[in-house]
Amino acid sequence: MALNLQDKQAIVAEVSEVAKGALSAVVADSRGVTVDKMTELRKACREAGVTVRVVRNTLLRRAVEGTSYEVLKDAFVGPTLIAFSSEHPGAAARLFKDFAKANPAFEIKAAAFEGEFIPGSNIDRLATLPTYEEAIARLMSTMKEAAAGKLVRTLAALRDQKEAA
């Protein structure tokens, strides 16, 4: 489908706007995946606050210029599906990783987080980031354990002091 100049400019502006507000981006190749499966992926992405687009590589290169996702330019080869996470940095990576397990034809090319290029083989780094709630829960459990440990050490010191006296 041929796009006129205004359509191309609109696509570049839209993708650029989404990229500027995103926390991370993941690039994949969806050749060989059925339309039904892709529809399921898009639905899951919408529910997780992830924007998914299939955009021509030249337009995508222009859209990410001047953003932290410029490092992904080399990954824009062949059919490109790009996902921007706007609510949680690991959301798109987690969804794509799970989808790739179930659909071997789906290939994750690369990802970017805070201007750092992450190859598709290392997608676990981004996919395993804890959500905000998980991070708070981990912090609270660590703080509780530290307080309990301090109490135990204090009681043990008191016991030792009384035994010595």
Curated annotation (Swiss-Prot):
Keywords: Ribonucleoprotein, Ribosomal protein, RNA-binding, rRNA-binding. One of its GO terms (cellular component) is large ribosomal subunit. GO terms for biological process: translation. InterPro entries: Ribosomal_uL10 (IPR001790), Ribosomal_uL10-like_sf (IPR043141), Ribosomal_uL10_bac (IPR022973), Ribosomal_uL10_bac_type (IPR047865), Ribosomal_uL10_CS_bac (IPR002363). GO terms for molecular function: large ribosomal subunit rRNA binding; structural constituent of ribosome. Belongs to the universal ribosomal protein uL10 family. Part of the ribosomal stalk of the 50S ribosomal subunit. The N-terminus interacts with L11 and the large rRNA to form the base of the stalk. The C-terminus forms an elongated spine to which L12 dimers bind in a sequential fashion forming a multimeric L10(L12)X complex. NCBIfam families: PRK00099.1-1. Forms part of the ribosomal stalk, playing a central role in the interaction of the ribosome with GTP-bound translation factors. This is Large ribosomal subunit protein uL10. It comes from Proteus mirabilis (strain HI4320).
